[in-house]
């Protein structure tokens, strides 16, 4: 691929994509969470998800869990999800019981864009898994994302989480 399509290789690398396995004659590149390949036919699923298993935390004190969830809500990597989850966490995290914290922790282990699309009810782009269909927490996040007060969202100050 590097020799066959130097302009494409340079363009993809400048945009943060990584070219892999160019010796096989097929092109494959990554944009972080999704892999694309040129050797699939029209009937194949072109996008394959990469999922990293979350760390199993046992006996984590609630104050440490809340602190970790605040950090994970604020530092997602995608601005839209950062703003949405950080505001949601600032408003609701301190009121959550242990079961709700576990559910929120599980939600944060999902892909950023999936969380964003589910929160904004864009199920055409990212279908909602059965696991989250009856989630009160996700419904609360969806209601929060409607921004009925029409506030301009920004990253909440850390004092808002107390």
UniProtKB/Swiss-Prot annotation:
UniProt keyword annotations, A-Z:
Chaperone, Mitochondrion, Transit peptide
Q: A GO term (biological process) for this protein? A: protein-FAD linkage
Disulphide bonds annotated for this chain are none
Q: Which domain of life is it from?
A: Eukaryota
Q: Where, subcellularly, is it found?
A: Mitochondrion matrix
InterPro entries this protein is in? SDH, SDH_sf, SDHAF2
Chief location category: mitochondrion
Query: Per UniProt, what is one Pfam family of this protein?
Result: Sdh5
Which Gene Ontology cellular-component terms appear in the entry? mitochondrial matrix
Q: Where is the transit peptide?
A: 1-35
Give the multimer and partner information: Interacts with the flavoprotein subunit within the SDH catalytic dimer.
Tell me the protein family, please.
Answer: Belongs to the SDHAF2 family.
What this chain does, per the entry, is described as: Plays an essential role in the assembly of succinate dehydrogenase (SDH), an enzyme complex (also referred to as respiratory complex II) that is a component of both the tricarboxylic acid (TCA) cycle and the mitochondrial electron transport chain, and which couples the oxidation of succinate to fumarate with the reduction of ubiquinone (coenzyme Q) to ubiquinol. Required for flavinylation (covalent attachment of FAD) of the flavoprotein subunit of the SDH catalytic dimer.
The cross-references to HAMAP family, in alphabetical order and at most eight, read: SDHAF2
User: What's the protein here called?
Assistant: Succinate dehydrogenase assembly factor 2, mitochondrial
Organism in which the protein naturally occurs: Saccharomyces cerevisiae (strain YJM789)
Which gene is transcribed and translated to give this protein?
Answer: SDH5
């Amino acid at each position: 691929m590097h020799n066959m399509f130097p302009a494409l290789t340079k363009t993809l690398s400048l945009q943060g994509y990584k070219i892999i396995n160019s010796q096989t004659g097929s092109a494959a590149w990554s944009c972080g969470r999704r892999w694309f390949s040129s050797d699939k036919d029209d009937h194949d699923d072109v996008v394959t998800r990469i999922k990293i298993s979350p760390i199993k935390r046992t006996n984590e004190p609630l104050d440490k869990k809340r602190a970790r969830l605040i950090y994970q809500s604020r530092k997602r990597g995608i601005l839209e999800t950062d703003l949405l989850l950080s505001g949601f966490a600032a408003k609701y995290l301190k009121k959550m019981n242990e079961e709700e914290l576990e559910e929120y922790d599980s939600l944060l282990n999902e892909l950023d864009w999936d969380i964003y699309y589910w929160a904004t009810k864009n199920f055409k782009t990212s279908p909602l898994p059965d696991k989250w269909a009856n989630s009160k927490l996700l419904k609360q996040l969806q209601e929060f994302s409607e921004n009925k007060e029409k506030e301009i969202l920004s990253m909440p100050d850390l004092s808002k989480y107390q």
